[in-house]
Regions:
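Acidic, Ser/Thr-rich peripheral helices and adjacent loops at domain boundaries
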Residues: 117-132, 260-267, 389-412
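C-terminal catalytic subdomain
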Residues: 347, 353-412
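Well-ordered mid-protein domain cores that form the structural environment of catalytic cofactors
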Residues: 77-156
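Glycine-rich phosphate/diphosphate-binding loops that line cofactor/substrate pockets in enzymes
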Residues: 45-66, 93-96, 325-329, 371-373
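Conserved, well-structured core segments that form the ligand-binding/active-site neighborhood
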Residues: 126-329, 336-339, 359-364, 370-372
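Short glycine-rich or small-residue beta-strand-to-loop segments that form or flank ligand, phosphate
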Residues: 59-74, 100-107, 171
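Histidine-anchored nucleotide/phosphate-binding helix
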Residues: 71-95, 191, 358-371
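N-terminal amphipathic/basic leader segments beginning at the initiator methionine
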Residues: 1-38
């Protein structure tokens, strides 16, 4: 089965020359998530328990990953809500009343009220948003940024001013892939454009050999250099990282998570009926259907404390859930591109994002070598309509129509 945007298809491949790679089975989630959260906050890695870091009169800032994770969105309550509520309860017990909550957007689009409520829950939103204490990071507002220093590579480290001036910065992360978390949480999510330009560029992409292996990724090397500046000159950071399983689709889409030979009669009927219905459905409605999916994936581990020590555990857990061993590269790699990527949640998968998802994310989902050999062929399936969201992706339109018509050379 191949994804084709807001639809899918069954294709025949040469039986004697094809290898089909399937994701591992979802790991079992934690039974008592709230108890696991509390235990982790009280037993962090290489740091004091969270209550010992809280005191009256302090500035406490809680930052969290935006809607680019997880994909699709999680069934409520989102684990960010559960973690932030636990942190707030401990802060209240310690007499902390100067608390800000910040969505770590980097340069992503701003979230809507409904999206924030889905992530944080009504209790947190109603308590903080009306008073201006829940807001979204602005990477281009000079009055809301603070320069912490410069790395030995000449990279300015400039982050959210409130976070920089806090006595404690608590970061709440979700990890689906090894690319996320660690210093990338704060050094990217709360960074200014002046900082982001050092690692979100074509040089970084062309000189990285996998974004899923930090040792081969220029993106991670830059973020870790910035992390050293933050460690020396920034706020104390209490990193909270979580792993979730890959239980992605609920009924009536559960057949999408199965291998084709595992389909029973009901699954095959659902596939045929869904595919036929989607062919008759306008793109806008089909898009709304898929983006309305709430995934049953849930938390399999939580670890808190010092950034690098925490991330080491998180990464090991990611690999346990996600790694598939493949022997040898292939001549031709086929990839079905689905309806969603980190940059089009509740939005349109425009032609640029199709390329970004396939050649950026999917191609780089490896640790050792790429699945396809150098000089090989990549075939992606997606209808790729000339369609853009004018509010979410306005700059993409000019880039697509004015720049890519003149050159496709990255350094140009």
């Amino acid at each position: 089965m191949f994804w084709r945007g807001e639809n899918f298809s069954l294709e025949k491949l040469p039986a004697d020359r094809s290898r089909v790679i399937y994701a591992p089975e979802p790991h079992k989630p934690i039974d008592d998530i709230d108890a696991a959260i509390r235990h982790s906050l009280l037993n962090p890695i290489e740091m004091d328990p969270l209550p010992a870091l809280l005191f009256p009169g302090m500035k406490l800032t809680i930052a969290f990953d935006d809607i680019s994770l997880p994909l699709p969105k999680m069934t409520r309550p989102d684990i960010r809500q559960r973690i932030i509520e636990a942190v707030l309860d401990m802060a209240a017990e310690a007499g902390v009343d100067d608390v800000h909550i910040i969505a770590a957007l980097a340069l992503h689009r701003r979230m809507t009220e409904d999206e924030l409520r889905h992530q944080l829950g009504d209790r947190v939103y109603d308590a903080f948003a009306p008073r201006g204490l829940l807001y979204q990071h602005d990477a281009e507002d000079p009055d809301a940024l603070a320069l912490l220093g410069t790395t030995d590579h000449g990279e300015e480290v400039e982050i959210n001013k409130r976070a920089a001036e806090s006595d404690l910065l608590v970061y709440v992360n979700i990890n689906l892939v090894a690319m996320d978390g660690g210093w990338k949480s704060t050094a990217t999510g709360l960074a200014s454009y002046r900082s982001l330009r050092h690692h979100h560029n074509t040089h970084t992409m062309q000189n990285s050999r996998s974004f899923m292996d930090a040792h081969k990724s220029e993106l991670h090397k830059s973020n870790w250099r910035m992390g050293e500046i933050m460690r020396k000159h920034g706020p104390k950071i209490f990193q909270i990282e979580t792993n979730i399983n890959n239980d992605t689709f609920p009924d009536p889409f559960a057949f999408l998570s199965k291998r084709e030979w595992e389909w029973n009669g009901r699954d095959r009927a659902k596939f045929v009926a869904t595919q036929a219905a989607l062919k008759r459905t306008p793109n806008r409605i089909a898009r709304n259907i898929f983006h309305g999916i709430e995934a049953p994936h849930n938390m399999t581990s939580i670890q808190c404390g010092e950034v690098e020590a925490v991330h080491k555990v998180t990464t090991e857990n990611v690999w346990k859930q996600q790694l598939v061993e493949v022997q040898g590269q292939t001549d031709i790699l086929t990839m079905g591109i689905p309806f969603i990527c980190p940059y089009n949640v509740n939005s349109i998968m425009n032609p640029i994002l199709v390329m970004c998802t396939g050649l950026g994310y999917f191609f780089n989902l490896y640790r050792g070598k790429p699945l396809v050999r150098e000089g090989g062929v990549v075939i992606m399936t997606h209808p790729t309509p000339n369609e853009f969201h004018p509010v979410h992706h306005p700059s993409y339109i000019d880039f697509f129509e004015q720049v890519l018509t003149e050159t496709t050379v990255p350094h140009d």
